């Protein structure tokens, strides 16, 4: 009998949400996603020590200023890990822009181009890279500019329908709506503590976004992210892509039985609405207390881990 991971792959592109090379070799995903937290975890893996040493040596060659060396080495380490992962996957690596730039369009564009340049210098073309940006208004504007310059983007920390709509209207390549973190918020802030998979607020959110995109003919890829259990994944089978942590990839691979398509749009494509203005975006996003909390919390957490990574690099310089 076929295992659930093999079955899921027939209807959805499976992406690995990890920086762990061993997991890549084991589960052979199409693409991979990283973020500051995953890079920090990956940096603890002994096999990656040479990548850290190389990044530090390179940073020392670029500048004699300690603060600049930290920035350079951190960027280079993220790219070095991405390069190792790209050896094992046929598709794309997602590398994230510093979360502390989430409200600065100009700085986000500059950092994205810096990361792309490092990949290009290592012989990797733009079509194998996605630049991850937080789905703030400023991050979406940065992505809009980058897309026009041939740099595809993955808009992350997406929790509200307003964020999803603004991303599609900006023509971004891919969005990563966070399923599990939405569930976390509702469990922590509501009376209901258990949800059937089809009632899971994160599943409901991604389903709504998927249907809206297909209904209006948006090309932006929907990639569900941040899963807490197998039920969420099974309920979103048919989504364009799903990025899944190694622990859940293992669970899927060890579970027998078919996975049936749950997401599909069979209606006619309708006209696109007038794009949201900045004021409309903020007003609609502000109506969702979960999205307000989780976007801010996600940016803070990624920024904290970026700081820890920089501290580790600083101590080694």
Swiss-Prot record:
Keyword match Cytoplasm: yes
Q: Where does the UniProt annotation locate this protein?
A: Cytoplasm
* GO-annotated cellular components: cytosol
Q: Which domain of life is it from?
A: Bacteria
Catalysed reaction(s) here are: D-sedoheptulose 7-phosphate + D-glyceraldehyde 3-phosphate = D-erythrose 4-phosphate + beta-D-fructose 6-phosphate
Primary enzyme class: transferase
Associated pathway: Carbohydrate degradation; pentose phosphate pathway; D-glyceraldehyde 3-phosphate and beta-D-fructose 6-phosphate from D-ribose 5-phosphate and D-xylulose 5-phosphate (non-oxidative stage): step 2/3
Entry EC number(s): 2.2.1.2
Identify the SUPFAM superfamilies for this entry: Aldolase
Alphabetical list of CDD domains matching this protein: Transaldolase_TalAB
- Spell out the molecular function terms from Gene Ontology: transaldolase activity
Q: What's an example GO BP annotation here?
A: pentose-phosphate shunt
Q: What is annotated as the active site?
A: 132 (schiff-base intermediate with substrate)
Taking the first listed entry, what is the main subcellular location of this protein, grouped into a coarse class?
Answer: cytoplasm
Q: Which keywords describe this protein according to UniProt?
A: Cytoplasm, Pentose shunt, Schiff base, Transferase
Q: Cytoplasm as a keyword? A: yes
Subunit structure comment from the entry: Homodimer.
Query: According to its UniProt record, which protein family does this protein belong to?
Result: Belongs to the transaldolase family. Type 1 subfamily.
Q: Which PANTHER family match?
A: TRANSALDOLASE
What HAMAP family does the database record attribute to this sequence? Answer: Transaldolase_1
Task of the protein: Transaldolase is important for the balance of metabolites in the pentose-phosphate pathway.
Protein name, entry field: Transaldolase
What organism, scientifically named, is this protein from?
Yersinia enterocolitica serotype O:8 / biotype 1B (strain NCTC 13174 / 8081)
Taxonomic classification, please?
A: Bacteria, Pseudomonadati, Pseudomonadota, Gammaproteobacteria, Enterobacterales
């Amino acid at each position: 009998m076929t295992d659930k991971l093999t079955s899921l792959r027939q209807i959805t592109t499976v992406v690995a949400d990890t920086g762990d090379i061993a997991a890549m070799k084991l589960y052979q995903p199409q693409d991979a996603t990283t973020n500051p937290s995953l890079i920090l975890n990956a940096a603890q893996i002994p096999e990656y020590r040479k990548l850290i040493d190389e990044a530090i040596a390179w940073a020392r060659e670029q500048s004699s200023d300690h603060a600049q060396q930290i920035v350079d080495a951190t960027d280079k380490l993220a790219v070095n890990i991405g390069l190792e992962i790209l050896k094992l996957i046929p598709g794309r690596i997602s590398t994230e822009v510093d979360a502390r730039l989430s409200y600065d369009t100009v700085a986000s564009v500059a950092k994205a181009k810096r990361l792309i340049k490092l990949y290009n210098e290592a012989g990797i073309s733009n079509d194998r890279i996605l630049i991850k940006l937080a789905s703030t208004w400023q991050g979406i504007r940065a992505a809009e500019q980058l897309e026009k310059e041939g740099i595809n983007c993955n808009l992350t920390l997406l929790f509200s329908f307003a964020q999803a709509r603004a991303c599609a209207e900006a023509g971004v390549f891919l969005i990563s709506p966070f399923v599990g973190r939405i569930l976390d918020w509702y469990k922590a802030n509501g009376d209901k503590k258990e949800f059937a998979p089809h009632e899971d607020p994160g599943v409901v959110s991604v389903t709504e976004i998927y249907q809206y995109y297909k209904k209006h003919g948006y090309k932006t890829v929907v990639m569900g992210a941040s899963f807490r259990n197998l039920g969420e994944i099974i309920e979103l089978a048919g989504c364009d892509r799903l990025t899944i942590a190694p622990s859940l990839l293992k669970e899927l691979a060890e579970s027998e039985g078919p996975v049936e398509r749950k997401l599909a749009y069979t209606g006619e494509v309708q006209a696109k609405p007038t794009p949201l203005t900045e004021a409309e975006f903020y007003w609609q996003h502000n109506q969702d207390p979960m999205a307000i909390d989780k976007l801010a919390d996600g940016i803070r957490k990624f920024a904290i881990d970026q700081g820890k990574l920089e501290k580790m690099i600083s101590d080694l310089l």
